[in-house]
Amino acid sequence: MKICFVTKERLSEFWERTGGEDADLIFFPLFDDVTVSYERELKGETAYFEDVALLSKACGCTVVCGYNTSTRGIVRSSAVVAENGRILGVSDALSSIDGTRNCGAFLKVYETGAGRIGVAVAEDAYFPEVLRTLAACGSDFVL
């Protein structure tokens, strides 16, 4: 399996520079300056999720992108998972070490062509029970 870890570029910068990547999975970490408003996405004022889906379709692979949300005063750290042009779901961080973000409610394992992906968002990576739970739920690997 080929995994492309994009560590310095945002999704739009990466896509403009490369036009995509020959990989089974493209992973963008959580950048503090990437914030998505679900309200604006639903109104069509922004297109972050659409861009994630389009990149996954153009590359024929799974794309996982971290981002922050700010909707009606509720701030979360999240990740969106897309495959072949379709959004598979959104995972929110369950943990907040400094209390500056709200926490999500559940963990999810995504069935993809790249395998069963468990998503640990932001500070969740510091809590072994999150990783153990994703493994117990059948993840082939955890991002």
Model-inferred region functions:
Residues 1-143:
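Enzyme catalytic cores with a strong preference for nitrogen-chemistry domains
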